[in-house]
């Protein structure tokens, strides 16, 4: 199984309840497509290096994932690009 780390930035003005639902939804997207979520945690609210969609800050969230193939990651990537609450995301394959 390959190990991946996903970091995504959530818009800072989202309500706590909506943020928790968003995180749960994207964790379930990964598990529904065959990946195993090892860890999913909020990092912190941080200042961005440059403005993204008129926001100067963002809520960072980190997810560690194990997957046999990249189907779950492709689906995560596709859906996070069209979700207005996620400002940016990055998927990195970790060395074994």
Swiss-Prot record:
One of its GO terms (biological process) is translation. Keywords: Ribonucleoprotein, Ribosomal protein, RNA-binding, rRNA-binding. The keyword RNA-binding applies. Gene3D superfamilies: 3.30.70.60. One of its GO terms (cellular component) is ribosome. Coiled coil: none annotated. InterPro entries: Ribosomal_bS6, Ribosomal_bS6_sf, Ribosomal_S6_plastid/chlpt, Transl_elong_EF1B/ribsomal_bS6. One of its GO terms (molecular function) is structural constituent of ribosome. It holds the Pfam family Ribosomal_S6. Binds together with bS18 to 16S ribosomal RNA. Belongs to the bacterial ribosomal protein bS6 family. NCBIfam families: S6. This is Small ribosomal subunit protein bS6. It comes from Streptococcus sanguinis (strain SK36). The gene is rpsF.
